[in-house]
Design a protein with these regions (language model features):
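Helix-loop-beta hinge of the Bergerat
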Residues: 1-3
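Conserved ATP-binding N-box helix of the HATPase_c
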Residues: 6-37, 89, 93-99
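Generic beta-strand structural signal
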Residues: 37-39, 107
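Short beta-strand element(s) in the Bergerat
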Residues: 40-44, 112
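Glycine-rich/acidic phosphate-handling loop/turn and adjacent ATP-lid/helix
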Residues: 43-93, 117
Length: 120
């Protein structure tokens, strides 16, 4: 079977890995992921809990996932470097923010919800 958009799948796989790791590092005990295949791309719905002491980390995560400017050339460069050993977790999350085509992050007192989209 021919894969039509393997890069979108690879990108979403990367997003899933990084988001899961980030949430568990913020004290999550349960993370739910729901992946939807849509005509325009792949949408990931995330729900999880976190420790209130880690709220600043999640606020930072929200900013990294929703950059003011998404530069396609920068995203492509980041994607090419994705296999390289980047400096720290923040670099990885900045990469995720650049490869996403849309992101929404909502923080509650101890819950976080995300809707992340990668176009085909």
């Amino acid at each position: 079977m021919k894969q039509r958009h393997p890069q979108a799948r690879q990108k979403m796989s990367r997003v899933i890995d990084e988001i899961g790791a980030a949430l568990f590092s913020c004290g999550a005990t349960e993370v739910s992921l729901r992946l939807k295949k849509e005509p325009e791309g792949l949408r990931l719905l995330v729900q999880g809990d976190y420790l209130p002491v880690n709220r600043p980390k999640l606020e930072r995560l929200g900013k990294l996932l929703q950059p003011e400017i998404r530069d396609p050339a920068l995203a492509e460069t980041f994607w090419e470097l994705a296999g390289a050993d980047l400096a720290d977790d923040t670099s990885e999350l900045a990469l995720v923010g650049q490869i996403l085509d849309d992101a929404r992050v909502t923080l509650g007192d101890t819950q976080v919800e995300m809707e992340l989209f990668v176009a085909r």
